[in-house]
Amino acid sequence: MKILGNIIPHFISSLDGFSRREIISLAYISIEHILGFNKSDCILNNYFVLNSKQINFLKKIVINLKNDMPIQYILGETYFYDLKIKVDKSTLIPRGETEELVKWILEHKFSSVLDIGTGSGCIAISIGHNSDALISALDVSKDALNIAQLNANMNNVNINFICDDIFKYNPKMKYNVIVSNPPYVLNNEKIYMSKNVLDYEPHLALFVNDNEPLIYYKRIIHLANKYLTKSGYLFFEINEFFSKEIINILEEFQFVNIELKKDINGKERMIKAIKK
């Protein structure tokens, strides 16, 4: 693996459990992270000689991939809404579906946003990077907020980060937008999830008790009813199997213009509601 052209064959021969297409994609992601070369650069620099540090890093990547560690955690970063975002095991890996939620939010006019359960800060930071809004972001995890602050600094976005428990927290101001991608995966759904998610991503940010699947939504809707401005927007990412129940709760709190939106995979994944 001393020569650039040998990296992809080495990945292919070393990794099983991935499709060939996935392996090649992982190899290119690793090469770009370590060498800064894109696919075209790889073709033009096929005989580029790697130093020992670069070779050792690539070997480490392969070992960790064989142990089912997500490439984002191995490299310590990913991209979200065209922004580089640092991640570690205290934060969820941002998903493409959440980019769709951000895109939807940015189609509206607003001057203030509260992101509840911010994790890596990807939602708050991408909104802040693409608007002039005043943004606050809440999380119960100090470790996650440390990563979120690094991401805000790295992307030159000013965010007011708050470390608190959503079940105890009460905002000090009203917001035009409240958004949340709260834990919504049931514990009994673990059997359907991949090993790399179960072994590495933070369960606190993923799972809810089977007996209280909507506990976070109920609390956030209650807060939004008090702390959204009139005609303010509430946005959620949701478990596709609980869309009707969440809509019912919103209607109980007299939210209006409730809109359910499917993600790119055709799953009911996002809800928007307006405070009356």
Regions found by a protein language model. Name each.
Residues 1-58:
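A short N-terminal interaction module
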Residues 84, 134, 158-160, 256-259:
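Conserved beta-strand segments of alpha/beta enzyme cores
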Residues 127, 197, 220-224:
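Class I S-adenosylmethionine-dependent transferase superfamily signal
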Residues 210-274:
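Conserved Class I SAM-dependent methyltransferase catalytic core
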Residues 33-107:
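Conserved AdoMet
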Residues 96-192, 219:
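Conserved SAM/SAH cofactor-binding pocket of Class I
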Residues 184-215:
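Mobile active-site "lid"/loop adjacent to the S-adenosyl-L-methionine
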Residues 72, 185-188, 241:
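Active-site beta-alpha loop architecture of Rossmann-like, nucleotide-cofactor-dependent enzymes
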